[in-house]
Regions:
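C-terminal, well-structured catalytic/ligand-binding subdomain of enzymes
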Residues: 1-36, 61, 66-177
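Short N-terminal edge-element motif at the start of the domain
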Residues: 20, 31-49, 53
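Short arginine-rich
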Residues: 52-60
Length: 177
């Protein structure tokens, strides 16, 4: 359906702790309903404005949701949300909305988000799928925590391009009908 949801583990904060009451929704439920097209992007936006988004009972995660039109919603339980409409969006395993809250939990040398942002800033208005994969390849992880899937969505083509297990010479394409 063109909806994509990415959940990333993050060090939790008390404000996002799981709560089981009607005014709350877990980040996992929000993401799952969006990916399954049970809710639209606009519905997700309304939900984050009206309800408290909390962690799942057994995991602390944040999410990036995007639709076929290229609209992006970053949701961090207990911290807030942000709608992005630029040419690209980034998320990582620490807070984007309140980075100072997760600074104590950063792994030394894990500067992929910063390196990616820097690389992206060097591109002009013309930014291709090939350019995006060059950036992803430059910041990929290897070893035990290796990047398993890297993907790029082209809103213009309504297609997602992806690479599995860092095999950047084998870019696959899936077009949404």
């Amino acid at each position: 359906n063109g909806n994509v949801g990415t959940l990333l583990y993050v060090h939790g904060n008390p404000e996002g702790a799981y709560q089981d009451f009607k005014g709350c929704m877990t980040i996992a439920d929000l993401t799952e309903q969006f990916v399954q097209a049970k809710i639209s992007f606009d519905d997700a936006l309304q939900i984050v404005q009206e309800r408290k988004i909390v962690y799942a009972p057994d995991a602390t995660m944040q999410a990036m949701l995007s639709d076929q039109k290229g609209r992006v919603l970053i949701v961090e339980p207990g911290i807030g949300w942000r709608e992005d409409d630029g040419r690209c969006s980034l998320i990582t395993n620490y807070s984007i909305l309140a980075p100072e809250s997760t600074v104590p939990f950063l792994v030394p040398g894990d500067d992929r988000y910063e390196r990616t942002a820097q690389l992206l800033s060097t591109y002009g208005k013309q930014f291709t799928v090939t350019d995006a994969f060059s950036v992803l390849q430059a910041v990929r992880q290897e070893g035990i925590w290796a990047t398993r899937v890297s993907f790029v969505y082209s809103a213009k083509e309504h297609a997602v391009y992806y690479v599995e297990n860092n095999h950047f010479s084998r870019i696959e394409r899936y077009e949404f009908s």
